From Swiss-Prot:
Record's signal peptide: none
Organism of derivation: Bacillus subtilis (strain 168)
Domain HTH gntR-type as annotated: residue spans: 10-78
Highest taxon of source: Bacteria
Feature: DNA-binding region: 38-57
Pfam family membership, one: GntR
Protein name in UniProt: HTH-type transcriptional repressor YtrA
CDD domains registered for this protein in UniProt: WHTH_GntR
A molecular function GO annotation: DNA binding
Length: 130
């Protein structure tokens, strides 16, 4: 389920958050799925329960999970929608910055369109561009 890289510069609680979000976006974890308790997950990934609790609190604040007192913690019904909307907002901001950078570098909009089509074709074809 979740794999922590102790050598990573990313804090463990952020690794938990990111991986939970990825599992939801990929459809591996679905709305209504029950999560391990804080102590259970801490034992599984060999982390401090306070670290797992911090991740769960942030995921709950973002609307990805919900805790039902006495019943456990579950993936919220709106988790995927919330995550997709967040991703789209992030992509739009990145695109905006890219267009600004391209403008100052003298790259014409038509050239950007051409590159987008090329890269899109590569992605759809399963090719990787390094």
């Amino acid at each position: 389920m979740i794999q922590i890289d102790p050598r990573s510069s990313t804090p463990i609680y952020e690794q938990i958050i990111q991986q939970m979000k990825e599992l939801c976006l990929k459809g591996i974890m679905k709305p209504g799925d029950k999560l391990p308790s804080v102590r259970e997950l801490a034992t599984i990934i060999i982390a401090n329960p306070n670290t797992v609790s911090k991740a769960y609190k942030e995921l709950e604040r973002e609307g990805i999970i919900e805790t039902l007192r006495g019943r456990g913690t579950y993936i919220s019904e709106n988790a995927k929608t919330t995550l997709v909307e967040g991703k789209m907002t992030m992509i739009k901001e990145q695109l905006k910055q890219l267009i600004i950078d391209a403008h100052y570098a003298g790259v014409e909009l038509e050239k950007l369109h051409e590159w987008i089509k090329e890269i899109s074709a590569d992605v759809k074809g399963g090719k990787k561009n390094d």
